[in-house]
Regions:
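Short, charged N-terminal beta->alpha structural module
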Residues: 7-28
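Residues in the short beta-alpha loop(s) of Rossmann-like NAD(P)-binding domains
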Residues: 14, 38, 86
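Hydrophobic anchor at the start of a short beta-strand
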Residues: 8, 32, 80
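Short, hydrophobic/aromatic-rich segments at coil-to-beta transitions
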Residues: 144-150
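Extreme N-terminus of proteins, especially the signal/transit-peptide cleavage junction
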Residues: 1-6
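A short, well-structured beta->alpha microelement
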Residues: 29-45
Length: 160
């Protein structure tokens, strides 16, 4: 791992798994750092990431006082992966809609893969489904323009 190689920035919104995410990125041979989810755009730009991961967290993305990522990250031209709250806040910030789900998902869940996508590259997909860990009570109900559903679960029409 060198600082001149690809660098992944992980924005932490309070997930209990942020350190695990960073470890997995580093195990893949990619340098990563964790910053607070609400860090300013200039600090993100100074880090010059080749990709950004938005972590999960305990908040509801549709709440007025929920933490938000700097909006400029969405125009930096780097790939962004939102996990749980990270996906929800990205959807909400870009014009989608997130609401409370009638059913919470906690523990192992099955995600039905809707279409092939490089996000699933190297992951064993069995009969078009993945076993994943879920911990959330909200769901994305309307996607932002230009987004597509690539996976869903029983309680989340947009799980990936």
């Amino acid at each position: 791992m060198t600082l001149d190689a690809d660098k992944i920035l992980i924005l932490d919104f309070g997930s209990q798994y942020t350190q695990l995410i960073a470890r997995r990125v580093r195990e893949a041979g990619v340098y990563s750092e964790i910053y607070a989810g609400d860090i300013d755009h200039q600090s993100i730009s100074d880090f010059n990431p080749s990709g950004i991961i938005l972590s999960g967290g305990p908040e509801s993305a549709f709440s007025d006082d929920s933490p938000k990522a700097a909006t400029e990250i969405f125009t930096m031209g780097v790939p962004i992966l939102g996990i749980c709250y990270g996906m929800q806040t990205m959807a909400e910030q870009l014009g989608g809609h997130v609401r409370s789900s009638a059913h919470r998902e906690f523990g192992y869940a099955e995600v039905s893969v809707q279409t092939s996508n490089r996000l699933f590259s190297g992951i064993e997909v069995s009969e078009d489904s993945l076993q994943v860990w879920m911990s959330h009570g909200d769901r994305v109900e309307a996607l932002p323009e230009g987004f597509a559903i690539i996976g869903k679960s029983d309680s989340s029409p947009a799980a990936a």
